[in-house]
Amino acid sequence: DIVLSSGHLNISEIWPLFDEAKKRGVNRLLCNHPTYVIGASLDDITRLVGMGAYIEHSMCMFVQRSKYKFYEPDELDKMIKAAGVDKTILGSDLGQVGNPSPVDGFRGVINICLELGYEENEIRKLISENASRLIGI
């Protein structure tokens, strides 16, 4: 069993890809940063989760001092709620020259989640447990 990541495909290309993957027995699906490059709406995120996909958001798009900060905390909250805590993964996509380190990104996104009212056990799922579950560990 593999994890099939949609990468930078447009949402219109992800539907047939994931449909075909499921027909062929692939059950571990991941959609990367659906609201950036991909063009997915919050409704699309909910629908992807309905297919069994995990939704990954890149911390670099939310944390301070990132060259790729495109979204505010309230938007992250909406994205998490569209997928649910159990199907959302927060990955770093940081560490480039001029950007915060991945560790600083994790600190930043954890603080954002705390400010948004997420509980410690929910944050642990978002930054660790869901990704572990996806890859089978």
Task: Indicate residue ranges for each PLM-predicted region.
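Divalent metal-coordination and catalytic microenvironments
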Residues: 4, 55, 93, 123, ...
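Charged helix-capping and loop-helix junction motifs
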Residues: 43, 69-76, 104-108
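Short acidic/histidine-rich active-site segments
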Residues: 85-102
